[in-house]
Amino acid sequence: MESFGRAIVIPERLMDAASATAGSSPAFVFMFIEALADGAVAAGMPRAQAYEFDAAAVAGSAQLVLETGRHPGDLKDMVCSPGGTTIEGVRVLEEGAFRASVMNAISACVEKAKAL
């Protein structure tokens, strides 16, 4: 059952949510990597190098969540130095409703799945 990846058994009532978050999130992650790279390119980094840096950062961050079992918010807080560049970027993302936009996208996917 796991020849193509990890199998997780869930109740049928969670199928739409699982489909939305597991099935659609790769596209959102690709968009995030692309946006990170676009920002780096705007700052002068070559695109290929930006993709390499940003894809590695996303992969490493995801691996930390899986390996440590720590809450993603705790991990975020660990890399935000007081008054530093990362917390400034987090502030800007929050001003732009980053989390709300992601949550709304998942909700839209769930509603679409229910309609199919």
Language model region names:
Residues 55-116:
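NAD(P)-dependent Rossmann-like dehydrogenase/reductase catalytic/cofactor-binding core
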Residues 1-18, 30-67, 112, 116:
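Internal alpha-helical scaffold of NAD(P)-dependent oxidoreductase catalytic cores
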Residues 21:
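Alpha-helical membrane segments and immediately flanking helix-loop junctions
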Residues 25:
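Aromatic-residue-lined binding/catalytic grooves and analogous aromatic/hydrophobic interfacial grooves
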